Amino acid sequence: MVNHKKIVLVLGNGFDLDLGRKTSYRNFAESTFWPFKGEKNGLGGYLDSHKKKEKWFDLENLLREYASSDKKIVPFVRNIQIDEPAFYRLKNSLMDFIKKEEVIKLNEESIAVYLLKQLCPTFDTASALKVYSFNYTDLNKVFNYLNIREGLRVDCEYIHGTLQNNSIILGIDEKVNCYPKYEIFIKTMQPTYESHPILKDLFFADEIIFFGMSFGDIDYPYFQIFFKDRCDENKYYEEFNRKRIAIFTRDVQSGQNIKLQLMEMNERRLMQMYNFNELKFFYTEDGITDELKDYLNDIWHNDTK
């Protein structure tokens, strides 16, 4: 049996968290790798002060606020000569922190592991599985750890760089009106930023799986055009245009947050997205359900072409 489906798997930090890695920005801020403990001034002081008072510590959003010329940061004073080296120190410390988490024992009972094992085809591997990771960790190390890499043809691109060559991309989106010289915080301005055909692959995929993505303000520009297209009633009538889209997230509340982000991206046409596609949400806290088993089994045993 040969399956000709095109499958795209998009991984966010929730994927690493489900594997058992403590890689959230909150974990980083509370670790011994945090570089700004006790600092009172500049970028370091600004970030450290918010670490103490915010339950949800969104590092990149805080960088966004700090760099924005529209945002007052009283009592902190911007000074690029101090903040630029602090920014690079932040990136280096984050890399050291994640390298430590990358080598821990994985939770083999997790939904993330179950998904990877089920996506390994048990028949002719003619189907194309393309992976896009927004994480800094090496997916090949996960495959090797689980002994499922051999014979599996996986093409993985790392949107924000990897730890392997110290090329991680940390920063903000380009819509921010930056304070002079703070454009260095913008992801696309960083020298290691590269092009990726993620939008093209999403458009041509039959099956799309998002795992651990929050679709927050920093990253949703990657997907906004795609999700708008998925709600276009004119496209719905085109042959073979219906897509199966699965979103894996932790629980119902995080699912609700994602739906709000989707409505923000597609002009509040979430109903059309459900109607014009086969959209499913899976919650990792529910474990391995019959619905999840049926969904993954259907990927490999129902050819769309």
Residue map of PLM features:
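SIR2/sirtuin-family catalytic core signature
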Residues: 1-19, 147-148, 197-305
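Short hydrophobic membrane-inserting helices
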Residues: 1-2, 30-35, 39
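Aromatic side chains
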Residues: 15, 25-28, 134-136, 222
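Generic structural "secondary-structure junction" signal
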Residues: 17, 21, 165, 170-172, ...
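Active-site neighborhood of HAD-like aspartate-dependent phosphohydrolases
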Residues: 19-33
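Hydrophobic packing residues within well-ordered alpha-helices of enzyme cores
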Residues: 28, 139-143, 226, 258
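Glycine-rich loops and low-complexity Gly/Arg-rich segments
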Residues: 33-37, 180-186, 233-236, 273
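Extended, H/D-rich, highly charged conserved domains that either
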Residues: 37-204
